[in-house]
Structure formats: structure tokens, C-alpha cells
Amino acid sequence: ISAISSISDMSMLSNDKVTSIFAEDVVSYVESLDVYSNPSFLIKGRSGLDFSFDIQITGKKSELVVKPFNVLRQNGIERFLFCMGDIKEAREKATGKELKSLAIINDTIEPPKNLINALEEYGTPTLLWSKREEEESKNLFKIA
């Protein structure tokens, strides 16, 4: 019986649940920064597809969409970059604001440098979760 109980406890930490816990931690962190944010932000792209972001932060001249990555993998980066390409122009036209993005990466396992470089090459700054309390990291959330 204790073996069955242990297996049941392990299922509580399945990948989807860990990802969800990390996303919740990111939302809590952003809320602690005293910025105006919207959790669970949904936006339609030029393709007609809907895309969701865990956080949207609005300013007068720009807005920031935040994507937490519990584990940084190429397929996740590809989906994210497609999403940003699909929504950016339409969103900027609709709001009259510049659309920016930020990737927050759980770095308990060191993320591949080439994937971080890919995000930054396409204009998405990255914040390593272990560095979130540094002033430079907090400044990433300050938008006009």
C-alpha cells in the first residue's frame, strides 16, 4: 500500500503540474513587482489562431507579454517565435502600442545557450529565474 501511495505522490509532480507550478510562481513574482498585469491573456494572431500568455503588462506606449519556460526546448521556442511573429503586427496596429516580449526561464537545469540566443536574436529578452531578484531583471518589467 505504501508503494501505491508513493506512486500516487509522484504523479502529483508530473511535467504538466511542475510547469503549472512554475507558471504560478512567475505570476506571483510579477504581482509582487507592483506593475499592472493581466494573467492568462489570450490574443488572436493574423493566422486566426488564438495564443495565450501567462502574463500581459500594459503601459501607455507599449505592452509586454511574458512567457515562462519551465524547461527550454527547441519546439517550445519555435512555437513561441511563430506566435510572436503572428501577433505582433496585428496587435500593434490594433492598440497603437509597441508589443514586446519576455521569456522567463527556469534555470534549475542549465538552459541551452543556443536557445537563449535564438530568443534574443528575435528580440525577446530572457530572464533566468535564479536572477529574478537582481535589479537588472526587475527593470525588464518596466515599460512605457
Feature locations, PLM:
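A short acidic/basic microdomain associated with nuclease active sites
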Residues: 27-47
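Short beta-strand/loop segments at the ligand-binding rim of alpha/beta enzyme cores
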Residues: 95-103
